């Protein structure tokens, strides 16, 4: 599954919401999932609702998404 930004992460902090986890988990049967755009720095965030991965809260949020996909046998790349 190719990447497509959904804008469903928390717009204040970039942490994936339960809706993000549900969205990707529903697609876990795809051969391979490439996530939406992810900012690696606070300054690099292009727009509200996009995902981020530059602090521990965000890492914990993405870990929940990844574990949910792996539980369904899926593969994901952030």
Residue spans of the language-model regions?
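Flavin-dependent oxidoreductase catalytic cores
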Residues: 2-77
């Amino acid at each position: 599954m190719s990447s497509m930004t959904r804008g469903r992460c928390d717009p204040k902090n970039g942490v994936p919401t339960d809706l993000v986890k549900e969205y990707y988990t529903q697609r876990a049967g795809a051969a391979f999932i490439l996530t939406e755009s992810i900012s690696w720095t606070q300054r690099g965030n292009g727009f509200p609702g996009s995902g981020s991965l530059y602090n521990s809260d965000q890492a914990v949020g993405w870990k929940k998404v990844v574990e949910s996909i792996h539980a369904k046998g899926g593969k994901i790349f952030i």
